[in-house]
């Protein structure tokens, strides 16, 4: 047996012995009557205590004579004869307990407290005071075991063994990793901030179907499921777009939805098959209005959630305080591939030659617009570090966007990039029912030619457009990628509580 395998075997034995001892303690608790009591109530969390009392001097705390009740997980314990110090962790952080034998009911200290284990969940009551080192603490007069932990804390056995364990057992990651807890607290604040921002601007939050007969609103491969009662194959939605625009037809002029989308595609540091999007639609507006809204949203969130418009990310600092850069797709290609002749981007053969010269395999079904978009993706996208809007997307890759009035080969569309990745996509909506029907037919032909991500023909949506969609602009923002930026996270798995994982065999 190798040294590594021997060490692993020893750890398994240690863990089994530890769990055996803990189960024996639980059995003793069961014999006493109520092993998992639910009658303890706390009146403060640790962060509330620190916010209110950290600044007070020891003498002032003593004079105030404040009694508090707290509850949480025992993370550390230092037993020093007749007294001990405990670190208790709750949702707000950590607070220190001072536990003295003579201040508790008879027998609690030696017969109960000393037999409890790290990871157990406790309830404590006592007076606030400060130690000689100035640490806010609770001098306990009551201490109760609320939940017996049968497994030890991860750091007792060298922490979580690998990165994947953090995702598979997120509960352990949250117990032991302050950074992870803060990431998901920030995510919650971002979502609350988005809702506040949208409602303040007259938008109504709505919910649209997660299972759809026709998957639409994006170019992606869907998940397929079966509805037994209807005996009908259905699709998990890839986007809510077409349903939201039906609502605008119906008279709800400003709507938004924050919810899950599902795309049966690859998993990477930027992609999870199940992800969260915010989509909004705004009648009597165009894509330029949404550029302004997007810039304001990100600037507001940075200031409100992080307290600054200078957001660090790896070696970069994203500046949400200054005006965001705006480039057309052709301008971006020229900027990051200076030798490009702009005229070549308007000619199929010339653009194809450029694409092939930089290693892009051009499919037979691609038109000029798709080729130029692929060139942009290859030469420019990774360089768009600071907040940047890219405009004038080809109509070929924008089947739901309104054509530009001056040049019908492009659309009134933008994508929003930060850190070299797309964060948002918005455009003036196509509200010409006949044009939309033709573009759906083009997508059907592309699917027949082998494009799995091409859209289906949605006859009911065309019918809705025939009733009249007001001039409208729509925007989609990837919430997970937004959270990555605001929390300095470099993989999408770090900002999704339970990311998609292959089952452990």
UniProtKB/Swiss-Prot annotation:
<dbReference type="InterPro" id="IPR004365">
    <property type="entry name" value="NA-bd_OB_tRNA"/>
</dbReference>
<dbReference type="GO" id="GO:0005829">
    <property type="term" value="C:cytosol"/>
</dbReference>
<dbReference type="InterPro" id="IPR012340">
    <property type="entry name" value="NA-bd_OB-fold"/>
</dbReference>
<feature type="binding site">
    <location>
        <position position="422"/>
    </location>
    <ligand>
        <name>Mg(2+) 2</name>
    </ligand>
</feature>
<comment type="subunit">
    <text>Homodimer.</text>
</comment>
<dbReference type="Pfam" id="PF00152">
    <property type="entry name" value="tRNA-synt_2"/>
</dbReference>
<keyword id="KW-0963">Cytoplasm</keyword>
<dbReference type="GO" id="GO:0000049">
    <property type="term" value="F:tRNA binding"/>
</dbReference>
<dbReference type="GO" id="GO:0005524">
    <property type="term" value="F:ATP binding"/>
</dbReference>
<feature type="binding site">
    <location>
        <position position="422"/>
    </location>
    <ligand>
        <name>Mg(2+) 1</name>
    </ligand>
</feature>
<keyword id="KW-0547">Nucleotide-binding</keyword>
<dbReference type="InterPro" id="IPR006195">
    <property type="entry name" value="aa-tRNA-synth_II"/>
</dbReference>
<dbReference type="InterPro" id="IPR004364">
    <property type="entry name" value="Aa-tRNA-synt_II"/>
</dbReference>
<comment type="similarity">
    <text>Belongs to the class-II aminoacyl-tRNA synthetase family.</text>
</comment>
<keyword id="KW-0030">Aminoacyl-tRNA synthetase</keyword>
<dbReference type="InterPro" id="IPR018149">
    <property type="entry name" value="Lys-tRNA-synth_II_C"/>
</dbReference>
<keyword id="KW-0067">ATP-binding</keyword>
<dbReference type="GO" id="GO:0004824">
    <property type="term" value="F:lysine-tRNA ligase activity"/>
</dbReference>
<dbReference type="InterPro" id="IPR002313">
    <property type="entry name" value="Lys-tRNA-ligase_II"/>
</dbReference>
<protein>
    <recommendedName>
        <fullName>Lysine--tRNA ligase</fullName>
        <ecNumber>6.1.1.6</ecNumber>
    </recommendedName>
</protein>
<dbReference type="InterPro" id="IPR034762">
    <property type="entry name" value="Lys-tRNA-ligase_II_bac/euk"/>
</dbReference>
<keyword id="KW-0460">Magnesium</keyword>
<dbReference type="GO" id="GO:0000287">
    <property type="term" value="F:magnesium ion binding"/>
</dbReference>
<feature type="binding site">
    <location>
        <position position="415"/>
    </location>
    <ligand>
        <name>Mg(2+) 1</name>
    </ligand>
</feature>
<keyword id="KW-0648">Protein biosynthesis</keyword>
<dbReference type="InterPro" id="IPR044136">
    <property type="entry name" value="Lys-tRNA-ligase_II_N"/>
</dbReference>
<keyword id="KW-0436">Ligase</keyword>
<dbReference type="Pfam" id="PF01336">
    <property type="entry name" value="tRNA_anti-codon"/>
</dbReference>
<keyword id="KW-0479">Metal-binding</keyword>
<dbReference type="InterPro" id="IPR045864">
    <property type="entry name" value="aa-tRNA-synth_II/BPL/LPL"/>
</dbReference>
<dbReference type="GO" id="GO:0006430">
    <property type="term" value="P:lysyl-tRNA aminoacylation"/>
</dbReference>
